[in-house]
Amino acid sequence: YALDSTTIDLCLSLFDWAPFRSTKAAIKLHTLLDLRGAIPAFIHISDGKLHDVNVLDMLRFEAGAFYVMDRGYVDFSRLYALHQAGAFFVTRAKAPMSARRVYSAAVDRSTGVVCDQQVMLNGYYSARKYPEHLRRIRFKDTESGKTLVFLTNNTVLPALTICALYKSRWQIELFFKWIKQHLRIKHFLGTSENAVKTQVWC
């Protein structure tokens, strides 16, 4: 699964129930996309102020499933709840993330993988939120030259497979682009919360 959200801007004077910024209104379409068929498994429509990470509290995690998400969803207590449910996550590390290395696996740097490590979070509160090992993979993209740092709780899959899983997250960006282009939700038939949500759903 890939988890992300997209924001749809609205006029504050017409949609005052959906505050976003001081002069703007917006709704957010929080979506869990099943990557096996590019079909949404979960959609939640909120006002523009709801932080993405709060959506993790609404999901029922499927044991054995992978949940791929960006840095906006990094909350160690919530990721630990996902871990305890028997599911796996793949995300990018926020900077700076304080962690100590416990173990380093051998890597083939010619593949772009710079390091593959087991780490423990530093800090009293962080360590309480996620008290087990995390896997940290540093990958250098040879095309862009960018170095990406991934976090996962899966210790079995090869490092390159974890990197490829994160790359598959872009399917949800294509899904959002398709929605905005084809479902014509730039023009709403009503201004109430129910009218907007009904139109998005239909």
Residue ranges and their predicted role:
Residues 3-16, 21-202:
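Single, function-defining residue in the core of a domain
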